[in-house]
Amino acid sequence: MDFKLTVLPGDGIGPEVMDEGLKVLNAVAKKYKHTFKYQYGLIGGCCIDKEGVALSPAALAMCKKSDAVLLAAVGDPRFDDPKLPVHPEDGLLALRKGLGLFANIRPVKVAPSLVNSTPIKAEIVKGTDFIFIRELTGGVYFAKPKKRWTTPAGIRKATDSMTYSENEIERIVRVGFELAKNRKKKLVSVDKANVLLSSRLWRQIVIEVAKDYPEVKVEHVLVDACAMKLILAPTYFDVIVTENLFGDILTDEASMLAGSMGMLPSASLAGIPAKGTKIFGLYEPIHGSAPTIAKQNIANPIATILSIAMMLRYSCGLETEAVEIESAVDKVLAAGYATIDIFKEGNTKLGTAEMGNQITKMIGG
């Protein structure tokens, strides 16, 4: 099969980890006789340097003509000053909005070989395997009104409003139900319905949509309680769905269960994934650009590689090939190979490129 992909390496360690991801994808393509055509674009700080914007209209148009988009990392400390008119992260928000990417899917799975690499006790994280679904294009991050001003008394004020429509809630909740019905048939919906009106609407919509999925057990959990339970009993969860802000915070918390943010992939989809469907999506590791370790060959490429596996599953309809990559990663980790972020005594320490080579070798490319 033939596929057209837009590749956005981005900032910091982005180009390095993307190289390893494409190395693995090329091995899969060779083994299964697929063709992936790559077209490259700029996003983030490197785009600001060249074009004055964090995402150019040309790059967005390129993405829209692709079967999927691969992104590595966005962020540059040179643009951290909040007074600057444009920031690298603006490109990511524009990409999500411009491509209609409303559903962020983040698997959190602890490899057996890494249970002692996390800050949580091994007996607690062992067996952790759940999926976070975060709404991406609504809520406080896309606030209207959103403003900052100074009062006549000289007091600085700012406001961001959290707004959700029932349509926005329903479509992301259906993503949760669709994934839950093909797993353990258990869905946890996270909100703050004891305080926020938007969360009360969220909970009401979840209850209504649940009628279409009688086989799925639904539980409503307040966001603060969820934050505690993720640490106390992560194996309790299977599929979690929540709004934008809560999801942003909770998914970073959950990343520590896996030992490193360098282990976790993500998919941002423009549709509801169901068996037999191909959904346009953006695929990226959850980690940042990590500029302090860029160009040192020490960044962990596994999150990018696993993001490519998710692309094969959701946007290309290639489940066997996706499992091939995931299995190769598991085997390499089980053999004791590790990048510096997950390294422990007894492991064989590898650099970025060397980890990519080992996973490629396991696939047979």
UniProtKB/Swiss-Prot annotation:
InterPro entries: IsoCit/isopropylmalate_DH_CS, IsoPropMal-DH-like_dom, Isopropylmalate_DH
GO BP terms in the entry: L-leucine biosynthetic process
Gene3D superfamilies hit by this protein: Isopropylmalate Dehydrogenase (3.40.718.10)
Positions contributing to substrate binding: 96, 106, 134, 224
Pathway: Amino-acid biosynthesis; L-leucine biosynthesis; L-leucine from 3-methyl-2-oxobutanoate: step 3/4
Site description Important for catalysis, residues in chain: 141, 192
Keywords, ordered alphabetically: Amino-acid biosynthesis, Branched-chain amino acid biosynthesis, Cytoplasm, Leucine biosynthesis, Magnesium, Manganese, Metal-binding, NAD, Oxidoreductase
Principal place of residence: cytoplasm
GO MF annotations, alphabetized: 3-isopropylmalate dehydrogenase activity; magnesium ion binding; NAD binding
Superkingdom in the source lineage: Bacteria
Cofactor binding, per record: Binds 1 Mg(2+) or Mn(2+) ion per subunit.
Role summary: Catalyzes the oxidation of 3-carboxy-2-hydroxy-4-methylpentanoate (3-isopropylmalate) to 3-carboxy-4-methyl-2-oxopentanoate. The product decarboxylates to 4-methyl-2 oxopentanoate.
Family per similarity comment: Belongs to the isocitrate and isopropylmalate dehydrogenases family. LeuB type 1 subfamily.
Record's subunit section: Homodimer.
NCBIfam families associated with the record: leuB
Protein name, entry field: 3-isopropylmalate dehydrogenase
Record lineage: Bacteria, Bacillati, Chloroflexota, Dehalococcoidia, Dehalococcoidales
Gene: leuB
